[in-house]
Amino acid sequence: MTRRVQLLCAWGAPVSMIAFAIGWVGFAGFLPPLSPSDNAAVIANIFAERRTGIRFGAIIMMVGTMFWIPWAAVVAAQPRRTERDRGVLPQTQVGCAVAATAIVIIAMLIWVVAAFRPDRPPELIQTLSDLGFVISIMPFAVFCVWNVALGLAIFADDGPAPAFPRWSAYLCMWTALLYVPGGALAFFQTGPLAWNGAFAFFLPAIAFFIWLIVMTVLTLRSINRPPGEDHEFSTIPASRQVPA
């Protein structure tokens, strides 16, 4: 992978963040998320009033989410320089990014369907709205595994010039822990553990975007490292190197 391609992939996270800011906040008006305690008539009215914005916002977020995959791939490729198994942890990270992208795209499509026909029964629109928010916010396990896999890869990168500083592995682990409250939204319609609450939505979302920013900066730094500091083959013992 050339340096230019790596740099393009590394900028995928900022692109996705901008897309979410424009789509989720600007067009759909889903910040804060719609209250799970609102009745069907209220939800149906919101989707009717914002039907164009919700559809545009969903399209923008679908496009932006796709940039998670190249970003995850280039981030996963950095500690791989010294990973002994040459594949398990990087593949896990990319697999989680693909799963996370698919989850978000499915949620966006559900909201498009909910906004597509405002003359549907309010209860049906509410069901689609609920389904979209549950799918987009609740699947914390995918993001936890993604972060933990990257953290383990950073810990395993014990060469003389590791791609990422060791503290970033702890950041990955703590961030993964902060995603867990999102799973509680299945049991609450009000309060901090509802899908519009501080613990189920805002804390995981803020943690995720901080993680994206920090890992993007560290990845750009790793990519721009002088060639002399690249130790892709330096960890292979001389006795195991194949003579030319």
Whereabouts are the PLM-identified features?
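Hydrophobic, aromatic-enriched alpha-helical segments typical of multi-pass transmembrane helices
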Residues: 1-244
